[in-house]
Amino acid sequence: MYLLRANLEILSVKMCDGKFSEQTIAKMEQIVQRMATIEQLEQFDEVIENDNQFHACIIEECGLKRLYTLWSSMDSGNTIVFYRGAGKNEYVVHNQEKIHRRVLDAVKTGDVQVICKTLIDHYMETTIGYLKDHGISTEEFPYKINVNF
């Protein structure tokens, strides 16, 4: 489900041709700033909430309510990905702002290719880390995000 969410976000970026409103960018900026204030592992639920709100901005930009409904129906899968990363929770807490700043900076370019590539990298970083933690070769992993821009 995690990589399906990534593909839905990429679809939204393509549908809006990489053009995000000033309001959406401002909202994403506020979320990233909120991410920077989280310092304690006890705030892990806020980390997940911020992540969902940030990525929801990407999905909502194209204006298709059904796309958002489909994407948000996978929230539980995203939550599981966060909690399955046990042992890396502190890393996520302390790096969430930096990780999402890259995506926001890409969004600000308005360039579909840059945004989509950054989203792929964003989602694959987590996926590759999970595979390595479980002794699975990335070459054996059958699900790749191969997106033509």
Each predicted region: which residue ranges?
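Generic alpha-helical secondary-structure signal
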Residues: M1-L4, N50, T118
